Amino acid sequence: MSSLVAFAESIEQSQVGTAIAESRYWWPIFEGTHLLSLSISFGLIFVTDLRLIGVWLRRVPVMDVLHQLRPYILGGFVLTFISGGLVFWSEAATVMVSPLWTAKILLILLGGLNALYFEFVIAKRPEVVENRTPLPSSVRYAGLASMTIWTVVIICGRLLAYLPR
């Protein structure tokens, strides 16, 4: 862990890290971009998840919802990742030692694995592709898991900003 902390300190103390942290404009721009892109990507993920669990848009085929929203979800996620990386760059050593940061990163990985499993396994099943009703329980579980994971990721991220480190 000490080598990771040393690496984080070098990132934070780099010219870029210092410039972001000390700038009157860059840090707020990156943080604002992070929050806005987070709202886009995870808001649309929630719409998708609500469809998967059968609460909303029941008459719209799952694959239609995914086809329409996927580019915006992925675009928002890329922007969230880039802006979050820039915010992290300015406070890497401070944030990295927090258990909340570790939980956030592990949950992001878990959320990604859940999405990949859904895309490459569950969404390929005939009953999903053909929009059979009711959808298999695996679809609902994937949606519930996604909603839970991403909600906790957001909570961890927001708590990082306010809890002592």
Language-model segment annotations:
Residues 1-165:
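Polytopic transmembrane helical bundles with strong interfacial aromatic enrichment
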